[in-house]
Amino acid sequence: MDQKQIEEIVRSVMASMGQAAPAPSEAKCATTTCAAPVTSESCALDLGSAEAKAWIGVENPHRADVLTELRRSTVARVCTGRAGPRPRTQALLRFLADHSRSKDTVLKEVPEEWVKAQGLLEVRSEISDKNLYLTRPDMGRRLCAEAVEALKAQCVANPDVQVVISDGLSTDAITVNYEEILPPLMAGLKQAGLKVGTPFFVRYGRVKIEDQIGEILGAKVVILLVGERPGLGQSESLSCYAVYSPRMATTVEADRTCISNIHQGGTPPVEAAAVIVDLAKRMLEQKASGINMTR
């Protein structure tokens, strides 16, 4: 699927919602304003700010314009300079700050108030707390008994597409991207004439939990939106795992189709929603997912 096809899908979905389609997006790293090469370091600089991310620490560069262009082209840690064999103080502090931010988003919980404000049914896996979630991934792949009963009682049975949201390893990925991905996703699926199940939130869920959900509800396609394991300085990245007719006993990882890096600096959430709608339609047409799909 090329960029032109993606933009056409986005326009179609947004038109059905009565909204103007966004202009073609570019990754944030392409528009970052870079600071000029500097020789001094400020302890007052906010290490999470755009200014800190654009900081160039190479002293007395031969071609400052080349460093500026390189810094604009990537979010990688380039042009940070050295102090002998060691990184400069600001580069090291920013590394530690980004590492701390990534750890924080793994350990944070999605507030119950936020889930209620979105009008989502909340269920959970067999996990009872974050520590157990991190040490027992196998328990995050199964729903607790109360969750099974809640889904049977409150969710639409036998949908064409069932959308599930889970915190995964990044709370920020869910709370930051939710408003921009779920409404256009649901609207696009309904516009396509598909029977859409009741969206709900699974606390402490792992990817494979979608197999049990699909089996319980009789869903043809299950779409799981889950927080990705955060990288350094990027804690808002969301993934979509889609699978056709999942079964706990027989579905393997190769049966899943994954769309990753969904965030404003990667694949924009609205654009991802349009791609997921198209993916769900093709899964239903081909009655397959993962490596079994024909491209």
UniProtKB/Swiss-Prot annotation:
Which Enzyme Commission number(s) are listed? 4.3.1.7
- Free-text comment on the cofactor: Binds between the large and small subunits.
The protein's matches in Gene3D superfamilies, at most eight in alphabetical order, are given as:
6.10.140.690, 6.10.250.2060, Ethanolamine ammonia-lyase light chain (EutC)
Which UniProt keyword terms apply here? Bacterial microcompartment, Cobalamin, Cobalt, Lyase
Instruction: Tell me the domain of life.
Output: Bacteria
GO BP term (any one): amino acid metabolic process
The GO terms describing molecular function are: cobalamin binding; ethanolamine ammonia-lyase activity
* Pfam hit, one: EutC
HAMAP family per the record? Answer: EutC
- Subunit structure, briefly? The basic unit is a heterodimer which dimerizes to form tetramers. The heterotetramers trimerize; 6 large subunits form a core ring with 6 small subunits projecting outwards.
What exactly does this protein do? Answer: Catalyzes the deamination of various vicinal amino-alcohols to oxo compounds. Allows this organism to utilize ethanolamine as the sole source of nitrogen and carbon in the presence of external vitamin B12.
Name it: Ethanolamine ammonia-lyase small subunit
Which organism is the protein's source? Escherichia coli O17:K52:H18 (strain UMN026 / ExPEC)
